[in-house]
Amino acid sequence: MGTNILYIEDNPDNMMLVKRALESRGYRLFEAVNGLDGVAAAEKEPIDLILLDINLPDIDGYEVANRLRHSTKHGLAYVPIIAITANALKGDAEKALSSGCDVYMSKPINIRELWARVEAFVPSPNPRLP
């Protein structure tokens, strides 16, 4: 059984890039295109890690992280959350961390950095050399 990652992202190009990168390492990726669907997917599927865009079309990533941290689903409040966002102004990282994210990454997405951040929480089921 592989490691399950939920990526909550409304941009299809970013979704495809991350999906290809993570699936090449053996991760199983679940997709959600908005915050409400992301919260629902996290509460339904067995998730090991969440990648979270901040600028979503319905509720923002800060609210998603807050809802996940207060979820009553067993263990969900402790699932690692990596914020991946174009928000790169002073204070954005702190806001993401204070909302419940464990790590903050700014876009554009650097695949090697993504692999390193993900693997710090959940080892790759199919590791490859960079």
Report residues per predicted region:
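Conserved acidic carboxylate
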Residues: 9
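Active-site residues of response regulator receiver
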Residues: 53, 85
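The feature encodes the CheY-like receiver
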Residues: 57, 89, 108
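Short hydrophobic/Thr-rich beta-strand motif most characteristic of the beta2 strand and flanking loop
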Residues: 26-33, 41
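C-terminal output helix
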Residues: 109-118
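Residues at the ends of beta-strands that form strand-to-helix hinge/output surfaces
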Residues: 98, 105-106
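Charged docking surfaces used in two-component/phosphorelay signaling
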Residues: 16-24
